[in-house]
């Protein structure tokens, strides 16, 4: 197997490791002899310290063998914004009041307003408190894994550039890919929870097949629109998504949940704060059978766009099934939906960047002391993370119902609690 690193790459890595292990860079690896000298200096700091230094440097280094990229990295938020405890304050607009600076006639009632009257004063200290809603996102989930490194592996790694490159391959590449895919799977659960949660709350889920049939007074099925009438349907979908994207820029109480005991929350989502995740195979068909510019993400101008080839399972790529965590709009508490939701065909979701996401708050690798009997070390990786779904932020889910005659029109199936089917998605929205 070919090495994953060039000699220049190896020198840079080992110099970084030396700085991490010793705190100084008095010797720099520039060729084989200096590489060995630096390796000896590092090993003199102790094998446990050496492995810790290697772990620290490599966990922040991209190794370009065949790294696996998280297909849903679009969901990841920063620790600064989404740490372990987040208090999100929402401010409501205050109603305008009668002017006290002029005597005037009320335009609605016709009554005369005379605040400026001889012998009276205008109270400029009338209290009018701001109206706010506080939403708390708390909680931390933890994850741990470890692997074993034998002492001879470490000693051999510093004999030459090629040995070190082989060591790095065994040390990190597969491990890094495994961790990245773990993140993707958790991001996928957050996405499933958000999509099913919007439907469980009856909150802006658009059946594009039903909308098409309503607009054009037709009774086409989903299968017909995806084949015989694909051109017309593609144009309709493109126009609808672009229109919705523009509508999200308006400051309204639409496209998100509102608490029943509070005034409506006014939200707007500028283009730069919009994100979109779409099922790409359909648009590949559109590009191949219609024309490539009918739906181009760049035309939307959203902040971030991600195409995926399946939502939940590769064998059933368009399906989404889940019993979501939702927001109780009566008491403001996070709760689990009473019934699971099943979509046959989800097309995509357009959402505010604060609507959902994951946050990896802490990642570190720690090495154990040498096992004297077995001559090996264990390297543990610890991860602390959290997820969030804020249903009070804007989001629109697009799905394709079965279509056909109105009596046969399909909405996502809602499973009863006695159903034999199992939910495969259950993620806390705001624990």
Label for each model-derived stretch:
Residues 30-32, 68-78, 184, 250-259:
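Short glycine-rich, low-complexity/disordered patches
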Residues 54-147:
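Assembly/oligomerization interface modules of large self-assembling protein complexes
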Residues 5-8, 12, 38-49, 53, ...:
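Alpha-helix boundary/N-cap detector
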Residues 131-204, 375, 379-381:
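Long, contiguous amphipathic alpha-helices that act as assembly "spine/axial" helices in icosahedral shell
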Residues 1-65, 69, 294-431:
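Extended, compositionally biased alpha-helical segments that mediate assembly or anchoring
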Residues 174, 185-237:
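Loop-centered beta-sheet repeat module
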Residues 224-357:
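Extended oligomerization regions of viral-like shell subunits
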